[in-house]
Amino acid sequence: MPPEAKRIVVKGFDPRKSRQRQETYYVTMIDRLNMALQVVMAGLGLKTGYQELYSGVENLTRADQASRCFNILQHHMSSGIQLLKDSAESFIQLEGTETDTNACTVVVGCWNKWLERVEIVQNIFYYMDKTFLSHHPDYPTIEELSLSLFREKLMAVKNIQIPFLNSLLQSFENLHSSKSTDHAYLQDAMLMLHRTEMYSSVFVPMYLVMLSRFYDTESSQKIQELPLEEYLEYAMSSLEREDAYVEKFDIVRDKKSIRETVQRCLITSHLDTLTKGISQFIEKRDAHSCKLLYALLQFNHETEYLIQPWSDCLVDVGFKLVNDESKDDTLVQELLSFHKFLQVVVDESFLHDETLSYAMRKAFETFINGAKGSQREAPARLIAKYIDYLLRVGEQASGGKPLKEVFSEILDLFRYIASKDIFEAYYKLDIAKRLLLNKSASAQNELMLLDMLKKTCGSQFTHSLEGMFRDVNISKEFTSSFRHSKAAHNLHRDLYVNVLSQAYWPSYPESHIRLPDDMQQDLDCFEKFYLSKQVGKKISWYASLGHCIVKARFPLGNKELSISLFQACVLLQFNNCLGGEGISYQDLKKSTELSDIDLTRTLQSLSCARIRPLVMVPKSKKPSPDTMFYVNEKFTDKLYRVKINQIYLKEERQENSDVQEQVVRDRQFELQASIVRVMKQKEKMKHDDLVQYVINNVKDRGIPLVSDVKTAIEKLLEKEYLEREDNDIYTYVT
């Protein structure tokens, strides 16, 4: 068995006296807490005794005196908030104005004082707060009690709340007006509103009204005073400023409604003015302002309101360009520059907005194909001419920019052109000249562009063009074969002949000329050789396309003249003249057998241009039958080989007319062929359906007029390919 435990006896212990001492301690501690709370709530602070008070609250809480402590605490906090309320109310009434920012300062001051006093209370009553109040739902924590008292006993008082809110809003308005404002007390005020749960229900609605009123007034003034691009800068900076205020003053939860309010005032209210301003930015080539405008509209999903002004602006600018005949020389460069700028705007300023990109493409199609009168076909013609210039000059014409990039930009324009057959006709004429007269700067560039056209338009579009290149290459091989044959041994001079297939090349007028005997013998020799190799074929000579290198001995020096065959034949007539003798116009006409038009043009190029190997006597713009021509004995030039261009009298206008006529004829044939194909397949069709079907079939090469389709139908009716039944129904005749 374990030993018996010893009993300890406390002598003189009296339970009744112990309880009395406890009660005395509780009363004493309660009195001290009352005194301490009274001092704290009066704002006098406690110098010492924190530890004793803290221990006293802990002991009271452990002794189930927490409810008693809470009642004391609640009483003194209520008294304390009453003191602050009376102080604030009396000061605000003394100031006598609701909009004075002092009201906000006073309330924020009360709030900061209250926080300081509550912090002391929390330190003293920490144990009770954490072990009793936090675990009893019927009791608020000290923080909950303090916030509730401040909200209900101070902020709910109308004599304080209304002046405070008006004062706070005035402070924010001063802040927006760039007036001096203490940011720190505004931050304290916002913290107070958040913690007292008055932010959303009381402050935000009034703040939005203030913002609306402020920006409505300011934006209406700014839109009148500032240039539009500066107004956009102002609007964007205002939105960025509001975002900064939202973060700084902890208004993040209402950022969306604040931004929508500001955007409505700055953007939506002036939407018509702003969107129409796009025309100013386009004319000034101001991509930055376009970017600002789009960004501002995008905030409220209002970019759709930019589509029509954007489209109208592009069409207006485009029509000004294409309808101005005086701008023909620079039209393509201006269109390229305009298109490149707009592409930058769409890609960078409008963030690849597909709707605005589509509107841009439709605008280009509208003005490029909708010019007035003779300018209607100008873009197609001038693009072909500009390409010709680039291919003749090379990269020097593009300022050193790779031609592949330039061609790509040109083809972007080319895609908008409806009359691609017009472009093809001019391009075909120009490429023929470059190939036949060896005027192309680079065969590689020619083939590169041809490949790009093929990818853009298809092989049918480039079929004839590819045939032209094949003819030139075959001619090189054939001429080389001729030069190495026995037939070439008796040639009087070096000869190169291009043998062309009529199906691929433009049609040229047959201009007659009587060649010098030795020249004619050389051509006859080549023709005989060619026909011996190509049985069943026939050769037709086009002297107007010929060119020569002629060696000339002038008194001031020997030269080589790069000239046309017509010019060469005229100059060679002067080999028979003795010193100082001349030849009359009439004699030259007789010896060369040139027509008056060709001879006049040739003589003008030799005697009236900048480079003049001949002298006309008497001088005139147009020679008469008696006009005399002499060798220019003072002729000189810094170059040994001198290029003398032919003078084309009104040829460009005539060429344009000829091309137009040829295109019209080709279109009629193409329309008739398309109608026959359609009717052969359908057998019967209504008039309107047939017209629309045919237009859709041929639109890739050019959109025909409805009247042209009707004309083609009438011709097929005359040729009895079609029959017309009642109700405008056509039947195909097999």
From Swiss-Prot:
<dbReference type="GO" id="GO:0031934">
    <property type="term" value="C:mating-type region heterochromatin"/>
</dbReference>
<comment type="pathway">
    <text>Protein modification; protein ubiquitination.</text>
</comment>
<dbReference type="InterPro" id="IPR045093">
    <property type="entry name" value="Cullin"/>
</dbReference>
<dbReference type="GO" id="GO:0006283">
    <property type="term" value="P:transcription-coupled nucleotide-excision repair"/>
</dbReference>
<feature type="cross-link" description="Glycyl lysine isopeptide (Lys-Gly) (interchain with G-Cter in NEDD8)">
    <location>
        <position position="680"/>
    </location>
</feature>
<dbReference type="InterPro" id="IPR016158">
    <property type="entry name" value="Cullin_homology"/>
</dbReference>
<dbReference type="GO" id="GO:0031508">
    <property type="term" value="P:pericentric heterochromatin formation"/>
</dbReference>
<dbReference type="InterPro" id="IPR019559">
    <property type="entry name" value="Cullin_neddylation_domain"/>
</dbReference>
<comment type="similarity">
    <text>Belongs to the cullin family.</text>
</comment>
<dbReference type="GO" id="GO:0031509">
    <property type="term" value="P:subtelomeric heterochromatin formation"/>
</dbReference>
<dbReference type="Pfam" id="PF10557">
    <property type="entry name" value="Cullin_Nedd8"/>
</dbReference>
<dbReference type="GO" id="GO:0016567">
    <property type="term" value="P:protein ubiquitination"/>
</dbReference>
<dbReference type="InterPro" id="IPR016159">
    <property type="entry name" value="Cullin_repeat-like_dom_sf"/>
</dbReference>
<keyword id="KW-0156">Chromatin regulator</keyword>
<dbReference type="GO" id="GO:0005634">
    <property type="term" value="C:nucleus"/>
</dbReference>
<dbReference type="GO" id="GO:0006511">
    <property type="term" value="P:ubiquitin-dependent protein catabolic process"/>
</dbReference>
<dbReference type="InterPro" id="IPR036388">
    <property type="entry name" value="WH-like_DNA-bd_sf"/>
</dbReference>
<comment type="subunit">
    <text>Component of the Clr4 methyltransferase complex (ClrC) composed of at least clr4, rik1, pcu4, rbx1, raf1 and raf2. The cullin pcu4, rik1, raf1, raf2 and the ring-box protein rbx1 are components of an E3 ubiquitin ligase, whose activity is essential for heterochromatin assembly.</text>
</comment>
<feature type="domain" description="Cullin neddylation">
    <location>
        <begin position="666"/>
        <end position="728"/>
    </location>
</feature>
<comment type="function">
    <text>Required, indirectly, for activation of ribonucleotide reductase through the degradation of the protein spd1, thereby supplying deoxyribonucleotides for DNA replication and repair. Also has a role as a scaffold for assembling ubiquitin ligases. Component of the Clr4 methyltransferase complex (ClrC) which contributes to the establishment of heterochromatin by specifically methylating histone H3 to form H3K9me. ClrC preferentially ubiquitylates H3K14 and ClrC-mediated H3 ubiquitination promotes clr4 methyltransferase activity for the methylation of H3K9.</text>
</comment>
<dbReference type="GO" id="GO:0030466">
    <property type="term" value="P:silent mating-type cassette heterochromatin formation"/>
</dbReference>
<keyword id="KW-0963">Cytoplasm</keyword>
<keyword id="KW-0539">Nucleus</keyword>
<dbReference type="InterPro" id="IPR036317">
    <property type="entry name" value="Cullin_homology_sf"/>
</dbReference>
<dbReference type="InterPro" id="IPR001373">
    <property type="entry name" value="Cullin_N"/>
</dbReference>
<dbReference type="GO" id="GO:0006974">
    <property type="term" value="P:DNA damage response"/>
</dbReference>
<keyword id="KW-1017">Isopeptide bond</keyword>
<dbReference type="GO" id="GO:0043494">
    <property type="term" value="C:CLRC complex"/>
</dbReference>
<dbReference type="InterPro" id="IPR016157">
    <property type="entry name" value="Cullin_CS"/>
</dbReference>
<keyword id="KW-0805">Transcription regulation</keyword>
<keyword id="KW-0158">Chromosome</keyword>
<dbReference type="GO" id="GO:0033621">
    <property type="term" value="P:nuclear mRNA surveillance of meiosis-specific transcripts"/>
</dbReference>
<dbReference type="Pfam" id="PF00888">
    <property type="entry name" value="Cullin"/>
</dbReference>
<dbReference type="GO" id="GO:0080008">
    <property type="term" value="C:Cul4-RING E3 ubiquitin ligase complex"/>
</dbReference>
<protein>
    <recommendedName>
        <fullName>Cullin-4</fullName>
    </recommendedName>
</protein>
<dbReference type="GO" id="GO:0005721">
    <property type="term" value="C:pericentric heterochromatin"/>
</dbReference>
<keyword id="KW-0832">Ubl conjugation</keyword>
<dbReference type="GO" id="GO:0005829">
    <property type="term" value="C:cytosol"/>
</dbReference>
<dbReference type="GO" id="GO:0140727">
    <property type="term" value="P:siRNA-mediated pericentric heterochromatin formation"/>
</dbReference>
<dbReference type="InterPro" id="IPR036390">
    <property type="entry name" value="WH_DNA-bd_sf"/>
</dbReference>
<keyword id="KW-0804">Transcription</keyword>
<dbReference type="GO" id="GO:0140720">
    <property type="term" value="C:subtelomeric heterochromatin"/>
</dbReference>
